[in-house]
Regions:
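Metal-dependent nucleotide-binding catalytic modules
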Residues: 1-8, 12, 16-19, 23-32, ...
Length: 167
């Protein structure tokens, strides 16, 4: 499947970023953050693994229409990746907080774990995705959205990125 190996690596990086952020913020269970990060893009991974033609079409739509991943996935599949990820995580008996982390509310999340998961996912996307716009400072954009919510600065984010790569 196009990009499956990359998606698995992105899952690991998101998990590592989430755990590092949880440690930095003193959350009681950093491994729960790791698990939430690991499953954040479960729906996309499943589509790439089990429906490679559809996944290739999503990537094609993104390129042809210069649209975002969510819009392209919805156009091709008729539902967002997160719906599939949530359904499978529930089916597998994953904890409710892990399921909630798959479609977290980002900066609006009332739960620190969910905000950290959303930030970790967006950070990973901004830094490592091939389809990220190289002309934009994606890290600055993500940090601007989440800095107040998570009380983070650019230096702390740099430390999170370095620690996660060591892992």
């Amino acid at each position: 499947s196009p990009g499956l190996k990359e998606l698995m690596l992105l899952s690991l990086l998101t998990a590592n970023h989430a755990r590092e952020l949880a440690l930095l913020r003193g959350l009681p269970d950093p491994e729960e953050a790791n698990l939430c990060g690991m499953f954040r893009n479960l729906g996309e991974v499943l589509v790439a693994a089990y429906f490679p033609r559809d996944y290739a079409r999503i990537l094609q739509v993104m390129e042809q229409r210069a649209c975002g991943q969510a819009a392209a996935a919805f156009e091709v599949l008729g539902f967002p990746y997160e719906e599939l990820g949530e359904a499978m995580a529930r089916n597998w008996g994953m904890p409710d907080r892990v399921v909630a982390g798959i479609r977290s509310a980002g900066t609006q999340a009332s739960d620190d774990l969910l905000a950290i998961t959303a930030f970790a996912h967006e950070l990973t996307t901004a830094v490592y995705r091939r389809d990220a716009d190289p002309a934009r400072d994606g890290v600055a954009e993500v940090l601007q959205r989440f800095a107040k919510r998570l009380k983070l600065g650019r230096d702390e984010v740099g430390g999170v990125l370095q620690s996660a790569l060591k892992e």
